[in-house]
Design a protein with these regions (language model features):
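Trp/Phe/Arg-rich N-terminal binding region typifying the photolyase-homology
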Residues: 1-17, 30, 43-47, 72, ...
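Active-site-proximal binding-pocket segments
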Residues: 1-154, 159
């Protein structure tokens, strides 16, 4: 993200090909692909906010390389639900699977899924040899697609009390380290910027999770505002 900036939101090395749509398969969102291990993992993602890293690759492969969805919308869908989500890592991983950030696409067939996820399923659209993947038609179950329309609801916070001449540590969605300058007498602010969450929305479960993490930091105050607004409160006059 530091190196490429917003460029990570576009195909980095190669244009993803083929692309039949810019949405996400309804069957993936509804955990109804017919691949039991994948469907169960998506259901667990909604409940817990977690998904095994290998399973994330399987889901991305089905979304991008089997359903032929451009990677961006499915990546946004997964990021929205992950408690440990990092947009840069997520976006670049999806691009790697889709072949837009690698020299080939990533595929996993049913035997691979069965091996690593204690499954014995057969006769699915993934129950093929790897040589067949490049010529497979989009399975009927994956053809219905939708956009992923999501938003993060941030609750307005009460005014916080800050001293202008006191060192201020600013925490954010990606930095809630309870040991950060733990031995210093400073004022601590968890800053939730609406513009960030508008661009990279996450679920209410994710917001609740970071609020729980913030409870581990003594004296931290929560502020829903842009960074510029915060600087006006703490910069010396």
């Amino acid at each position: 993200w530091i190196a490429k900036g917003d460029g990570i939101n576009e195909d980095l090395k190669h244009a993803q090909d083929p692309v039949s749509n810019h949405g996400i398969s309804d069957a993936i969102v509804d955990h109804g692909t017919g691949i039991n291990a994948i469907d169960n993992a998506i259901g667990d993602l909604y409940k817990t906010g977690y998904m095994h890293n290998h399973m994330r690759m399987y889901v991305a492969s089905v979304a991008c390389n089997i359903a032929q969805s451009h990677w961006l919308t499915p990546a946004r869908w997964m990021y929205y639900h992950l408690l440990d989500g990092d947009w840069a890592s997520n976006a670049l991983s999806w691009q790697w699977v889709a072949g837009s950030n690698a020299n080939k696409k990533y595929y996993a067939n049913q035997d691979n899924i069965n091996k690593y996820f204690n499954s014995s399923q057969k006769q699915t659209f993934l129950d093929v040899d790897y040589e067949q993947f490049g010529t497979l038609a989009i399975p009927e179950v994956l053809t219905e697609v939708s956009d992923f329309d999501s938003q993060t609801k941030l609750t307005d916070t009460a005014d916080i009390l800050l001293e202008r001449d006191k060192k201020t540590l600013v925490y954010n969605y990606y930095n809630l380290d309870p040991d950060w300058h733990a031995d210093e007498e400073v004022q601590r602010v968890l800053l939730l910027e609406p513009s960030f969450f508008k661009t990279y929305p996450v679920s209410q479960k994710c917001i609740d999770f970071i609020m729980q993490l913030a409870n581990n930091i003594a004296g931290i105050q929560i502020l829903v505002a842009e960074f510029e607004s915060l600087t006006q409160q703490v910069d010396p006059a």
